[in-house]
Amino acid sequence: MEILVAAILVISINIIAGKTNYGLEGDEVFSYISSTSMGGFKGICYLDDQKWYDADYFRNAVTATGQERFNVKMVIENQAMDTHPPLYYFFLNLVCSVFEGQYSRWFGIGLNIFFMLFVGLGLYLLLQYFVQNKHISLISATIFCCSYLAVNMTLFIRMYVLAMAITLFQSWYHLIVYNKMISVNEYPFKKYGRDYVSLFLLTISGGLTHYYFLVYQCLISAEFVLMLFIRKRYKDMCRYAAAMMASALIYICLYPVALQHLFFKYRGRDAVHKFLKESGIFNEVFAMLSTFNSQLFKGTLFVIMLTLFCLTVFLIIKKKIGLFQLGKLCFLVLPSVIYFYVISKASPFITIRYISPVSALLYAAVIVWAKILIDTAGRNNIKKTASIFLCICLFFSSFYFFKKPVKAAYFAERMDVINELSKKSSYCVYIGDDMAYWRMWEDYINYSVFRGLYFIDGQKKSPITDECFLEQENLVIYIDTNLEPEDIFAYLNTYLPSYQYEIKYTTNYTYIVLGEKMSG
């Protein structure tokens, strides 16, 4: 019953947040394009200069119809063109395929809410393993799934919630297998094959979700091997290593283009270059930590850490706790902190999505640390009071109270502006910057409010001869922000001399302009 109530709360919080935060980023629109379009972004997003595209063109780009439905091969081919693995997009294709020819951002949000329930389950199992208290584990897991960070990731229609869930289950299952291993003399494949297969499948699933998962997998595997080595479980160490190597080989066989993505495409090369460049050892890490602290702990993380540290030192001095008792934190902390550092340095932007896979593990480490200290109390009533206080602190420091919007206001404002402008003109124009057409993805879900879109290459500035374009009384014009608006207005005035132009809204990538024909 408690688990059902927790699940309903998580679902409700995310739905309410989804209703008050709308509009999609370009990457989210790209998730739909990758999941539902034959030919992927190369077939859909590279537009021809001086050509009309009707509303159905953009509507079809984000909906699954005909052969696009339940098409695993299409999704894999689309992602091979891009720089990400295909598993999440396969799931999104399944959802969109059920609703043939329809688009809704709730398809992606609903899928992420489903995965967030697994995040809650994985975090609950992990916490229960350490704290051995169902109420603390359930309440803490629920609060995390209702935090600003978790809601942010749920509403962001990409693969990060799925990556978070797989990371949690992989961590928890490694602990389960390790405990089983040290409780018996040997852990052969023949007798315990199910456990090796489970680790094998989780590893492949994580690698097919996001390449950053492979960084965490290497770290947790190294830690696992070290733990077995210390216990002189050499045969089990070799069996585990064999299972992981087998998973790597099968992974490459299933998705061979991963090697190209990791070592030869721009994302892989740029990640290595950014990690190695001398920009200050901790600059990016501190920036990422600030974002993490703000989104998960509302800026209270350092106060929490200082409090726990001081209590720990006090209890060590009083000989009520030993370093050995704190050792269990190493399994959670070491791979997570190293991942946090590496990805903060290597990721292209300072944004929470890249470190979200280990965010729940770091959150769990704080709770486990606090519970270790609570357990030093002698009397049960003191432990109970301290546990209640811990849950209250987590609630106020992490629970999302809707005071801060998850998505930037301009996503919603832009949609409102476009809807108003569509009343002025039935057609729109996009003037792009050479081949950087990805900058127009953000509005693929909005272009369909117009009857058609006329695409112009803003670098070529070819003569405009299209009669339909030249006959328009008003035009809604998108101009790539890489281009100078005044230069574009001068170019348009050559063919539309009686027009005046007003920039109605500016986004990161486009100026949204209303062009009106002057009377007389």
Which residues does each PLM region occupy?
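Transmembrane signal-anchor helices characteristic of membrane glycosylation enzymes that use polyprenol
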Residues: 2-62, 246-259
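Interfacial juxtamembrane loops and adjacent helix segments
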Residues: 36-84, 92, 96-101
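Specific aromatic-rich, kink-prone transmembrane helix
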Residues: 94, 122, 142-146, 150, ...
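Transmembrane-helix motifs of polytopic, lipid-linked glycan transferases
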Residues: 107-131, 169
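Transmembrane-helix signature of polytopic, membrane-embedded enzymes
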Residues: 123-146
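Membrane-interface alpha helices of multi-pass inner-membrane proteins
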Residues: 140, 188-211, 222, 246
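Hydrophobic/aromatic-rich transmembrane helices and adjacent perimembrane loops
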Residues: 163, 215, 346-378
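Membrane-embedded, lumen/periplasm-facing catalytic core of multi-pass transferases
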Residues: 393-460
